[in-house]
Amino acid sequence: MEATQNDRTADVKFNRLKLIVCVFLPALLFWLAWEPMPFTPLVFIAFVPFFYLAEWGRSTSKGKNFGVLFLALMLWNISTTWWVWFASDVGAIAMLILNSMLMYLPFGLSRWLQRKKWFIWDAKWLFIALWLLYEYGHHRWDLSWPWLTLGNAFSGMPWYVQWYEITGTLGGTALILSVNVLVYHALMNDQSNAKRSWIMRFRLPIGIVSVFGILSVLLGQLASDFVYQKKSKLKQPYRVVAIQPNYDPYDEKFVLDPMQMVRDMAKTSDSAGPADCILWPETSLVGNIDVGSPAQDMQVSYLMHHWLKNGPADNAAGDSSLNHSRAAGPPSMLIGSNMIHWYSWMGKGKPDVAARQSSNLEYWYTLHNSALWIQPELSIHPIGSDPFKHERLRGSMATGDIQFYHKSKLVPGTEQLPFVTVLPFLERLAISLDENSASGTLGKNATAKALGVSNSKVAPIICYESIYGDYVSEYVKDGASWLAVITNDAWWNNTPGHKQHFSYAKLRAIEQRKWVVRSANTGISGFIDPLGNTTMRSGWYQGRDERSAEVALNKHLDDGFFSAGESGSKRSYEWNILGIKYGNKLEDNSLGATKITQVGTQLALSQTIYLNQYRTVYNRLGDGKILAILVLSMLLLSWFNRKQKQF
């Protein structure tokens, strides 16, 4: 077999200093490229040192090859996800080790294939196919941790990946690795390229990056008219209020009186004025609401009574400049809740992998991390014999419409113990974040489920689920016209964790071309438009001066409200002063006006969004078909470049 470029690179000399640089450099580059750092384009060269290490490993032992690459991958994981330590030290160590080992698999398999005599493909392009398969699989097993999916890196540059509505994050991963391969080969072709300018040497990777940037700008412009419906006579405005109660999950959330917390959050919700839907964060209702009779729960009953009595009509006087789609009647609510499902079982073993036995051995129960959708309804009864003569009416509370969804993408180690069906002893190793919240394997929905009615259905995305683009697609297929993320991000303290989590929601907005509204108990609450632009956001513990690391809001209510008469430049300036980003793309300022109020230490963010039932190419294809297209493309490139013996 003739010598090829891949064979020649094996002769490159690797001294100790070069090896050390290649081990530590990827961690530095990925740290600078990942949110919240602002140097995202560095991902286009961050993998080049890994390719150098892989080339060095071809001429050394398996042990040395694994050790060096594993160390480099571990440093990458530490530099970008070290903050998991604040939630669980044991969990963080296990995650870092396991994730680094899994990342090594594409390298190890590529090395094994290259050593086979029958191997005739270009190893680098084949490596991309293997990495794509690794990412796809890592989204779909019991120890799933796709936080460092390469395509997530562009959450800091949403303007560049408007084409995610076609490919999703897998397309971003393929682009990043392809550019890295081209950069690597340009660097390795020293003899033929030494006398060329760097622009000529790197013209192909630069050209590809530029083409995707231009494509993104064009797609963004096309989507902008649709997103804000500038040319449509049929607008569907929908006003949403997102609450950020700022309860410390360790010292307050599961310790304070649940009913008092509900009353406080209801009062904060009232301050926001009229709304179509009110959004409360994950586990806002902490008393394990019975799946069989949620309307009978004291907290749920209180909320329905509260909004039947204090609906938007009572709050509209102070907000006459705001238009919203619900003319009268109480708003719907989407609220995070702990739920419990009781059932009897006298058979052998456990009735379900998530089942727990009560003190009465006949009865079992399953705990859930859930989202409740509540639509209070008013039952009107006339007083007197003739209801048609404008006689005084009295209202009585009806149960209303209550729907719920149980979180399906569970956090490994805390909400789901891996492989407990075959290794049941692992159930005892559950990591508890605190002494009151549920741990161990939780019950879950079999599929994603949109909640609500008709054209205003919502995707109830609970915390960890928001990093799964393909799973979010299932909500939209079920009829969701907007995305709600309810979460509690304070487990990680004030670290990059909650910022990355918020930023990933921008990618979900682009993939589905849907508005995203985020309600965080602590962390970042806000609104993201279908182009991935943040139109309004809060800060870490914003409203609690003793905890907030950002500029605190003025204590006056409605300080964040801007009327239609104010200029866009003034809005941007004032919102930036508050530490809040605002987008100026809304066609009708009265409909899109943002408002933020503060009651005590709690915040209420409100804005009018536009609903749509549009399904993107990504939503229709799904990760499976996109993976097949990308892997086939990489295999063809691998074959072509090996046969041509050059790039």
Regions of interest found by a model, annotated:
Residues 84-90, 137-169, 353-469, 558-587, ...:
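Active-site catalytic loop in hydrolytic enzyme cores
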Residues 215-217, 256, 484:
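Class I S-adenosylmethionine
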